[in-house]
């Protein structure tokens, strides 16, 4: 379900402060965030965020196509190791 337009996008307050500080300083360090639910805004383009996936911070470099999506979409929380193979097919 999509968020109401009149409410506007959700962004964690601390995330905005960190992004503004990174822009002002001009440093290109990874900004560590835990807020996977925050929406990516146009002012985040060009910055690199470390989005926490429950295990580690996955580096996400924000570009224009990501605007409007959530940070959590770009940091998978589960790893797929594949299905087990058919043992009969391997022997033949």
UniProtKB/Swiss-Prot annotation:
GO CC aspect terms: cytoplasm; small ribosomal subunit
GO molecular function terms listed in the Swiss-Prot or TrEMBL record: rRNA binding; structural constituent of ribosome
Gene Ontology biological-process annotations: ribosomal small subunit assembly; translation
SUPFAM superfamilies recorded: Ribosomal protein S19
Keywords: Ribonucleoprotein, Ribosomal protein, RNA-binding, rRNA-binding
Membership in a protein family: Belongs to the universal ribosomal protein uS19 family.
UniProt-listed NCBIfam families: rpsS_bact
Record-linked PANTHER family: RIBOSOMAL PROTEIN S19P FAMILY MEMBER, SMALL RIBOSOMAL SUBUNIT PROTEIN US19M
Function: Protein S19 forms a complex with S13 that binds strongly to the 16S ribosomal RNA.
Protein name from the UniProt record: Small ribosomal subunit protein uS19
Source species of the chain: Nitrobacter hamburgensis (strain DSM 10229 / NCIMB 13809 / X14)
Recorded name of the encoding gene: rpsS
């Amino acid at each position: 379900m999509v968020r109401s337009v009149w409410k506007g996008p959700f962004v964690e307050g601390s995330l905005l402060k960190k992004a503004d500080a990174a822009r002002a300083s001009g440093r290109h360090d990874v900004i560590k965030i835990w807020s996977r639910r925050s929406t990516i805004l146009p002012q985040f383009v060009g910055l690199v965020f470390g989005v926490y996936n429950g295990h580690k911070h996955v580096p996400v470099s924000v570009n224009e196509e990501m605007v409007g999506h959530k940070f959590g979409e770009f940091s998978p929380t589960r790893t797929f190791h594949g299905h087990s193979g058919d043992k009969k097919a391997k022997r033949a």
